[in-house]
Amino acid sequence: MNTRFELQELVTLARRHSGFYASHFADIPPHISSLEQLPVIDPVEYWKGSHDLDHWPVLTAPLNDALVFKTGGTTSAGKFSLFRREEWQTLVTDFGRSLDAQLSAGDRVANLFFAGDLYASFIFTHDALAQVETEIVEFPFTGHIDSNLLADAIDRHRINVLAGIPAHLLSFAAWLEQNGRALEGVTALLYAGESLFDAQLQRLERVFPNARVASIGYASVDAGFIGASHRDCALGEHRAPEGHGVLEILDEQTGEVIEECGRVGRLVMTNLTRRLMPLIRYPVGDRACWREPPGTSGRKFALMGRCADSQRVRVGILTLLPQSIGETVLRITGSDDWQLVIEQDDATDILRLHWAPDALTPANAEADQTLHSALIEDYPLIRQLSADHLLVLQIRCCKVQELARHPRSGKRQHVLDRRVYNGSGQGTC
């Protein structure tokens, strides 16, 4: 079945069959000629009611013949992304065909992504690898395999490509280093889910001396296939997937469509293959800039970190939900003035939660520790990452004046991503 839709067709279907889009497009004329005529989705409104899949107003049809995945948070608190089976097949086929750019005939690929608890990454990668037109071999280990067993299997079976999330690849690299091992037969490390930074690349190079490092591609379980990774892409760069969706970069304050190269804005996706759960001008949560001029086929763009209003933030294998963190801060401190600052020291992520006490509810000595404990309870992975020296969590009470604001709008930024992304040093086109 053909699941690709022209824009007008998609908009008409969404407004007729989705309560959310009927309201969202209420002031839009029946016929449109460009995306710019349509309002950008507010993710908070989009995901309202998504916990009740039988009555979620975004959906255009009953929940039949579908796949359900989790997008961030715990199973009970997280949001869900839904695909008709033919939509899923279109997604993995398009993504899989893009992998031909990164794989060679005879490659033996270890799939080290994670499975279970409604996570999509392992299943998605497995299904996509099945669509690669080059002859390859997949070893579907998952990310739960013991490091010793994995290292031995790589040697024994001459596995030369490792595909996984950066935090797991780094954890495996740390184990290899601690045990005095290097895997010279590995020729490629393909990562997804989070950016890799210079200090982390150096750690990988020490134990995988002959491996090139590249993104496997840019996709998310909510927005779908967002960017293809080609050999001419530097770290952090991808190419727009023509035919699968339409990418826009918008000014974060004015909403103006950005066409020039090098100017950073928020990345917005219109997916042309999704009917059950349409995504029309949906902010994916990342900032980006164009690397090539308008009209370029498969136009290249560079990721530049998370948006300040992102609905979720990735730090290694950890997915943080800013809205949930804000609710925790308010419950414990009585204050709505807080900021999450993400930095990096060598190969370790530094996560700092700054909060300012309300004038009517002054700070108490126990609040920082209570917040620290509450975050670990909400995100148990923090304890594991801290033990592996991959993450440091710090809580600090501060004055409200110390919380950073956007230099143009003056708005409070709840998420401040200060990590230096590889794409930030590239020149403009």
What is the predicted role of each segment?
Residues 48-182, 188, 197-203, 207-208, ...:
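Active-site phosphate/ATP/adenylate-binding loop shared across adenylate-forming ligases
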Residues 162, 268, 273-384:
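AMP-binding/adenylate-forming catalytic core of the ANL superfamily
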Residues 18, 165-166, 193:
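Helix N-cap/beta->alpha junction signal
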